[in-house]
Amino acid sequence: MANHILYATDKNYCELCAVSLYSLLSNLHGEVVIHIIESSLEERKDDLIKIAKMFNKEIDFIPIEDISRRLVEADIPPYRGGYSPYARFFISDYVDDGRVLYLDCDTIIKGDVAPLINYDLNGCPLGAVIDQSSSHVNVLIGHHQHDRYYNSGILLFDVAKCRETDVPERFLEAVKTIDLSNTFLGADQEIMNVAYYHQIATLPQSANMMFTIRFFEPSQIWSVSSKGPSDYYTKEEFIASKNNPLIIHFAGGGRYQPWREEGIYYMDEDADLWFDTYEKLYPDGRYDVAKLKKIMNERKKHSFFKTAGTFPGLYCSLKGLYRGLKLLPKRIRARRAFKSGSSASSGD
């Protein structure tokens, strides 16, 4: 039974995808099949093929048009101009069996992902890492405040279970209940948490270590986000993951990404690893590594940048409350209707 790696990218994110792919294959032990859902990659496709060949691998490119067509037929509107954010949830239509590890392009891998791919999902169709965002987001999407809310940047799919529970169809049903112009933390993430409510296994936090939380203590996260060990991670799990992360996820937009001049990111070993990998692959690339390193090192001298990175939970809470309160009654009715329909279907 084969195991699989999945990315989704276009020509604008190709260089980020290349860095992640190179770091993945540099650390990988064992055989995997690599799939990339591509949108308008054109000649940039050769960048990724070249990296795969360095490690005697091939890439199965899946045109986004195949998935887009299905979404258009279901009257699903695009999100931010396209359908790429949704594509990962249709991978069971393209893979016969085994496990699929999906990775966002804004990641860098620091170890062998083989043990993660074989992680026990407890019968669930997919696994994810709990997001650090405020528990109030749960209320705003019609869930209980202390339900677990998951990040969609790194996902582990069990293909057989995806087919058994019809993951693509549940996604299509859920997206119809959501106003895509007013999502709190990204349409794909919100849809995932609604569509697979109580069907997502919790992965170790080390599988998706975000810059936005690495300077928190567990008690700070629990305080700022109104979470606790029951709907987040224990103190021991949190510290172990911070000390030995498997996958670094530069989530949070330009503020938390080392390749962006704007924002608050400052130099650390993960930024250094990203820059070194990028320079190796793109010595004349679009990012000026020397300039970026200088900016990051300057930021490191100022405590503000260290402090500013520790408030994403509060930021997400305020953002979610501001954007969501107006739509709260409508959202709760839609979610209850969706969950009621799902329960009726499962009882047939």
Where are each of the predicted segments found?
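Short, acidic, metal-binding catalytic loop of nucleotide-sugar glycosyltransferases
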Residues: 23-31
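N-proximal low-complexity "stem/linker" segments adjacent to membrane-targeting elements
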Residues: 1-22
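Conserved donor-nucleotide/metal-binding helix-loop-beta segment in metal-dependent transferases, i.e.
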Residues: 107-141
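Short internal beta-strands
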Residues: 33-39, 128-129
